[in-house]
């Protein structure tokens, strides 16, 4: 019943990014190349996130490759304790990325869902005892970056479009997997400010929104209590828009105040489609 309650009433057209191996080349001269983890749940629930990620990176001179076989990082299976399924997903993803890495000149492996990014950064620990995978897992974990980390190293100010009347204010929700799992808290807010938004934080920013892993399904009462507490704090912050870096949080909190991925707001500020 809890799982059914979480299903959206409608779904967008499934994301074409990742249906096959693709490379999105920048129109500007650049020297960087990254692999993007397109994700599984995110591709079904909000394809706009990958589209915004690719647009922004391309404008910054970054070539983006997505591998068809790397369809899932294994986090969802790992969250429910299905170690076998998680390991198979990890293996498929690692072997696919190994082919790409062996071509050379890959600067980063980019995740734009922080739950996935935390998982990928932990691959070296997760399969470090596997002789087949240990080497490539260490290589991948060393290259794994949240999208905010990649953009922070690039000349973002150079692609921002003018906004004489300002861009408005955003409340930033810090996903647990980003602020606790990856120790990234201030950076996304800095990027939002850099492109012209006023950024607010809710009180108790360290608290979970109730959507970590699958306990919003397995422990719905606890998860709903956390959700309501987070929404009340967001409402008190007073901004008309909310940014977050994880699809689970976005789905959990989206409602009267629209919640979008941080990269969608950055894309909007750089000439992309409106985020809300």
Task: Give the residues covered by each predicted segment.
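Iron-sulfur cluster-binding electron-transfer modules in prokaryotic oxidoreductases
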Residues: 1-276
